[in-house]
Amino acid sequence: MRTRRAVAAAVLGAAALTGCGVQPTGVVTAGEPASGLTRGVRLYFASPSGLTAVPLIDRRVDDLNGALKLLGATEPPPGQGLVSLVRLGGYSATGSGERVTVRTEGPYGGSGRDQATGQLVCTLARAQSVLDPTVRADDVRVTFRPTEGEPLGPLGCAEFLGR
């Protein structure tokens, strides 16, 4: 008796699931792939809780020096407690694949673990991944080469996030 009830319940359940009236459909075209914050340049700003990425929706960067100029010229969004600790001047950046080199006139003023260095590293890593779509921002390593003093790096953006 128990077996009959179990079989009947299973058959009834299967019939209910397959008989819901939804007809199969073919492939539905949905247009272009999704886009949003994962594309485009982001500038990184400092806050008491760490670095925060700010997307630049209406700006285009043609090279890494353009990203540096944007970082120096763009005010952080108001009301979020974000600031820029980077004072630009005497920096130039070049990139190839996953490597970015920042050349500085004179000694580099950052310690390598400060938020100003993080702003530069993360902004340049993101810009390099936009300029070379085969490169992931997480894989970019930035090295600072001052005209005076020792090189600093290579540094990755992840070292500065989540602090």
Task: Give the location of each predicted region.
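Bimodal "functional hotspot" detector
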Residues: 2-163
